[in-house]
């Protein structure tokens, strides 16, 4: 499906080399002052260009055409569009019948038979620009509650020097610095090594993967459901839906399976504070008021410029040599997308939580 969320719903449309991509946000509350400059600034973070991203030059100017009146949300669907301006479909003519290793081509062909081969069509990460715009709307709503969502690069390829994330309180991740870093690095001291890792892969006509950490500050306790809408399950669902994400860890993640209970448990201090944060701010599918900490693992960009073996639509063995413009490391711009998806999840869960108690219902209706 092309719709995400329960109370706050985002529906996206468009393909990589089509005329435009866009989205409709439904369920956004009325009365929220919309800062369009902030939305554009978030899109600019994800915008292609530069030596650490694809050379495809897109302005990514968002045009909002509904749901906003005199700069304020009016409670109706918010529609917006981003026109594609720099497609080079001819780069894909020679491979239109071939399946690119590491891409969704083969699966799309088996499912739909007809597919848009230009830049991957609907499966392209180009669509994530829409998610970033929608996530910016969600952050504007979250700002009303002083909730801050940020992401940054924790590691690139073999450059993984940030330490164990099992207890994020002990790590010196600088999320504010990451917003100014060319590659969104959480560690200023390791940034050049990470950059070199990307450039070395790029110069070898190859690519490299990376890890992104997302943090939510000032999130209230009590968000999430006890069974099938656990907020950690929703977060994993949202982040695994980003192109190239192969694994998601919350808090200590897989490291928790190596601990003993007395080590993994976060002792509770006065005023509802926690000594450690192995849980990543979530217990029993519900937030506990500590920071939400999540790590997303991105695979290397599948589009590389080395010859690869594959087959065509008839099953004949072929050799694939790609052209075009591709990110040497999708984790870099993926960090912006991870932020957007987390914003949408938290905002959705806050809206869902409104009817969880009789007290909250009475406050609204009486």
Curated annotation (Swiss-Prot):
Pathways per UniProt: Metabolic intermediate biosynthesis; chorismate biosynthesis; chorismate from D-erythrose 4-phosphate and phosphoenolpyruvate: step 7/7
Q: Which CDD domains match?
A: Chorismate_synthase (cd07304)
Residue positions annotated to bind FMN are 122-124, 243-244, 284, 299-303, 325
Q: Which gene encodes it?
A: aroC
- Annotated binding of NADP(+), by residue: 46
Under the subunit heading, UniProt states: Homotetramer.
Protein name listed in UniProt: Chorismate synthase
Please give the catalytic activity noted in the UniProt record. Answer: 5-O-(1-carboxyvinyl)-3-phosphoshikimate = chorismate + phosphate
